[in-house]
């Protein structure tokens, strides 16, 4: 099988991000490629297909696990490191040279370099929180690349980390716990163990938590246990969602809850658990969903397939956008070796 065909068959997109201008969508995969879509292409009529994507290879040794966007930089979370690439909007181009790079420290008893599995950006304070495969959440200053502190408590790798405007951080991990942290305290302030709730436990799928989301009043999480919503003050489960698969993504979208994972549908519910939309997807598993309401309203769902699934009204599937096989200049280029990315001086953790 040719490399191009192999990538089309086994494309696994774990990460997406939207540019600060809300005009570009970035998608990164485990082959080390970053795709860029002009969001205005989604506003074309249904008869006219979206334009081709741009691709920016990072090298076959770079697993792109998570993406975030801050100021003029696309932030990439990979294996053992986080780095920033400058985005030139006029030229619609990502820099080939990394502007900065932060290495995740290896623990004394570690046998492998930890993955950066999830990131949450506090854009107002230019701080990034990275949940990693060593069970630690790292607080990184984007001003100087310094790791400011480590949040320790999880006993297995962190799958998801999110935060809110109140200085709280929420993390879900393989150890089956959801922990709530304060940037002003050393230890977690509270902890949930959803698998201990008989209404949530699914014994065949384990206790791990694959995704966490939060808004002003509610905490949403799921994984092996069923997806459920908890009130932030009481930390009591108020609603259990009927999503039938393992949960790898969840989010509050407008006044609804979006849930996806190892299932052939992504589902949208009311906060009371009423199913509103059952959206068919071609992904073997869905790992990422990003959305915005303006200037162009859409959700993009990605996972283990070669297609981005686009919803314009948040309830119905509007289009599927191919990635490999739909890249500018691809039909003219021979198979090439991976482009090498110039690497700057590395900021080591203290």
Swiss-Prot record:
Q: What is the similarity comment for this entry?
A: Belongs to the WD repeat THOC6 family.
Its quaternary organisation is:
Part of the THO complex containing HPR1, THOC2, THOC5, THOC6 and THOC7.
Q: Which InterPro entries does its entry note?
A: THOC6, WD40/YVTN_repeat-like_dom_sf, WD40_repeat_dom_sf, WD40_rpt
Q: Does the keyword Transferase apply?
A: no
Q: Where is this region: Disordered?
A: 328-350
| Pfam families xref list | WD40 (PF00400)
The membrane-spanning stretches of this chain are: none
Q: Which domain of life is it from?
A: Eukaryota
SUPFAM superfamilies for the chain: WD40 repeat-like
Q: What does this protein do?
A: The THO complex is required for cell proliferation and for proper export of heat-shock mRNAs under heat stress.
Keyword check for Nucleotidyltransferase: no
In which ranges do the WD repeats occur? 151-191
Q: Where is the composition biased (Acidic residues)?
A: 328-340
Supply the alphabetized keyword list. WD repeat
Q: What is this protein called?
A: THO complex subunit 6
Give GO cellular component annotations, separated by semicolons.
THO complex; transcription export complex
Gene3D superfamilies noted in UniProt: YVTN repeat-like/Quinoprotein amine dehydrogenase
Cite a single GO BP annotation: mRNA export from nucleus in response to heat stress
């Amino acid at each position: 099988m040719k490399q191009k065909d192999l990538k089309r068959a086994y494309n696994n997109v774990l990460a997406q991000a939207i540019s600060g201008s809300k005009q570009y969508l970035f998608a990164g995969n485990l082959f080390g490629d970053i795709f860029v879509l002009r969001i205005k292409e989604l506003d074309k009529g249904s008869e006219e297909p979206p334009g081709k994507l741009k691709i920016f290879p990072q090298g076959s040794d770079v697993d792109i696990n998570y993406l975030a966007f801050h100021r003029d930089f696309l932030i990439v979370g990979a294996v053992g490191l986080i780095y920033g690439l400058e985005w030139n909007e006029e030229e619609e181009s990502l820099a080939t040279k990394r502007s900065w790079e932060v290495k995740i420290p290896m623990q004394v008893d570690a046998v492998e370099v930890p993955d950066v599995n999830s990131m949450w950006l506090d854009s107002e304070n230019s701080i990034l929180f990275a949940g990693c495969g060593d069970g630690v959440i790292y607080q990184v200053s984007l001003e100087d690349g310094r790791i400011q502190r480590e949040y320790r408590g999880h006993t297995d790798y962190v799958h998801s980390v999110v935060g809110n405007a109140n200085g709280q951080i929420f993390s879900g991990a393989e150890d089956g716990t959801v922990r709530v942290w304060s940037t002003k305290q050393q230890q977690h302030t509270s902890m949930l163990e959803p698998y201990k709730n008989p209404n949530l436990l699914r014994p065949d799928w384990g206790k791990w938590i694959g995704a966490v989301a939060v808004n002003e009043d509610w905490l949403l999480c799921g994984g092996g246990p069923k997806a459920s919503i908890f009130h932030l003050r009481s930390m009591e489960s108020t609603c259990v969602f009927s999503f039938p698969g393992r949960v790898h993504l969840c989010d509050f979208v407008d006044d609804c809850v979006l849930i996806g994972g190892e299932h052939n549908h992504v589902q949208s519910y009311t906060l009371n658990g009423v199913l509103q939309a059952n959206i068919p997807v071609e992904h073997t598993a869905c790992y990422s969903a990003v959305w915005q309401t303006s200037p162009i309203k859409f959700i993009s769902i990605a996972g283990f397939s070669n297609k981005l699934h686009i919803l314009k009204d948040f309830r119905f599937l509007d289009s599927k956008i191919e990635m490999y096989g739909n890249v500018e200049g691809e039909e003219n280029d021979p198979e090439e070796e991976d482009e090498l990315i110039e690497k700057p001086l590395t900021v080591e953790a203290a």
